[in-house]
Amino acid sequence: NQRKMVDSINKNDILFAIGPAGTGKTYTAVALAVRALRNKEIKRIILTRPAVEAGENLGFLPGDLKEKVDPYLRPLYDALDDMIPAEKLKGYLENRTIEVAPLAFMRGRTLDNCFVILDEAQNATDMQLKMFLTRMGPTAKFIVTGDLTQVDLPKKNQSGLSTAIKILDNISGIDIVYLTGSDVVRHKLVRRILEAYGDLNNN
């Protein structure tokens, strides 16, 4: 199904990749963005994720904004580290060819001539996801990744991701790819763990 992601983004401008931890959805999305940058199909990569997760609010974290935000964005940096030599990546980040920022920073912008990845989108509210998707400029590609079994939003907030995949399913140019436990690319035990928790949740 990672192959489906590759085929889909070649044909569509917005791709939702939905699946459990370890299925390589974020890694594949970042690889596709790096490929597009190398092929000069786009000028910039923007990686973002909601910065409120697991009950933590940025207001309660110590340090300046970069220090506060970076722990949330670490998995995106990790994927980039695997694909781009350290010095080159440093240069890209400094000249903003690659930007890694929390979702709130997308408000009011038009994201054009770039490849944009929203990771952990299950933790975006309806309003946040609508705000994000409507930032899209005419020559942008968007990949939205998420796992609907790992929603960290307060109970009163429904995941914007579950709403989006229901209401946007039949729009031309938008595709939804579902990854499953069989797509897990981490240690073989990860799939077994996910299956065990799935059994627990179903009982």
Ranges and model annotations:
Residues 2-18, 22-23, 27-118, 122-203:
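Conserved helicase motor core of SF1/SF2 NTP-dependent helicases
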